[in-house]
């Protein structure tokens, strides 16, 4: 059994999509996506916030290797991570929004707490 969801995509496309979703979540504070994509995004975003809490140069470079925009990484380390200094995990929340009109896929809103 795999430790991650394949989401019906080849590895490079799946990785690119998750990088985009995590970058958008950290940039805007919330995103709207399907349940399975949100669960994968949540896992990675929480790891990025934990890197931000660590705050050293190596953690910043690890975050830069995944997050696509340098300004988002700067915001993560300067604003987002300090907000969660006292919290051990559970930085995100998911709300069910209902089925998507086009294909009936269950849509959720994933946001930072």
Curated annotation (Swiss-Prot):
Gene Ontology biological-process annotations: translation
Keyword Ribonucleoprotein attached: yes
GO molecular function, one term: structural constituent of ribosome
InterPro entries referenced in this protein's UniProt entry, alphabetically: Ribosomal_bL17, Ribosomal_bL17_CS, Ribosomal_bL17_sf
Subunit structure and binding partners: Part of the 50S ribosomal subunit. Contacts protein L32.
NCBIfam families: L17 (TIGR00059)
HAMAP family attached to this UniProt entry: Ribosomal_bL17 (MF_01368)
Family to which the UniProt record says this protein belongs: Belongs to the bacterial ribosomal protein bL17 family.
Protein name per Swiss-Prot or TrEMBL: Large ribosomal subunit protein bL17
Source species of the chain: Clostridium botulinum (strain Eklund 17B / Type B)
Lineage, uppermost ranks: Bacteria, Bacillati, Bacillota, Clostridia, Eubacteriales
């Amino acid at each position: 059994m795999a430790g991650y969801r394949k989401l019906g995509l080849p590895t490079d496309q799946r990785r690119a999509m998750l990088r985009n979703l995590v970058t958008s979540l950290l940039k805007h504070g919330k995103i709207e996506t399907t349940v399975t994509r949100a669960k994968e995004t949540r896992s990675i975003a929480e790891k990025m916030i934990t890197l931000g809490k660590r705050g050293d140069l190596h953690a910043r470079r690890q975050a830069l290797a995944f997050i696509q925009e340098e300004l988002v990484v700067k915001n993560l380390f300067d604003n987002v991570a300090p907000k969660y200094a006292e919290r051990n995990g559970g930085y995100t929340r998911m709300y069910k929004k209902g089925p998507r009109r086009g294909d009936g896929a269950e849509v959720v809103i994933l946001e930072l707490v």
